[in-house]
């Protein structure tokens, strides 16, 4: 039995509530069990200078954790002078994941900034951020179309993310913090609604895992992402 008492293939309770930030063009409060992340999408009329004249837009992301999102208070990274390596890695992952399913020329030479702020962390903050950020971005595109800023929907597909791992020899889906800490293997999968793989991050914490075990985790992740995509569809109507 896994520490959370869930079945091996069972997600935590996931909710996606859009329209939670009054001023943002798009927003979503996402929960994966006790993990809670506020995702917002902000439209900037000017894109990056290096894309000027290309006719393409850009999507970038920033990620942060509130100081007391964890068991003990963490120092705000702004006071350290720069984001940690972990934060930079997650920011880039969120941006890459969203750009993989967006027609960037359809945005025009504009930039959309995704902010993912972790209110409470219990494992899977990066996977929750990607899943919720897609909803916030979808709402931003809807806002842009309603004001004739863009004429077509730039969104080409859904994208969501989920963690998988091997705990006491058993493959499990959507690890919370206790499970992640005790897992022999853990991995994050970013997958599109049509089944395309955007990114895989996997680590053997104890002993190397086999190709067969990896493929088992991939199958588990695809089943989890299919459920998350269904929830995204419900959230955006």
UniProtKB/Swiss-Prot annotation:
UniProt record, GO biological process: rRNA catabolic process; rRNA processing; tRNA processing
UniProt protein name: Ribonuclease PH
Keyword tRNA processing (UniProt): yes
SUPFAM superfamilies for this protein: Ribonuclease PH domain 2-like, Ribosomal protein S5 domain 2-like
Family per record: Belongs to the RNase PH family.
Function (record text): Phosphorolytic 3'-5' exoribonuclease that plays an important role in tRNA 3'-end maturation. Removes nucleotide residues following the 3'-CCA terminus of tRNAs; can also add nucleotides to the ends of RNA molecules by using nucleoside diphosphates as substrates, but this may not be physiologically important. Probably plays a role in initiation of 16S rRNA degradation (leading to ribosome degradation) during starvation.
Class in the EC hierarchy, top level: transferase
HAMAP family with a match to the protein in the record: RNase_PH
Organism (species): Methylobacterium nodulans (strain LMG 21967 / CNCM I-2342 / ORS 2060)
Cross-referenced InterPro entries: ExoRNase_PH_dom1, ExoRNase_PH_dom2, ExoRNase_PH_dom2_sf, PNPase/RNase_PH_dom_sf, Ribosomal_Su5_D2-typ_SF, RNase_PH, RNase_PH_bac-type, RNase_PH_CS
Residues annotated as binding phosphate: 86, 124-126
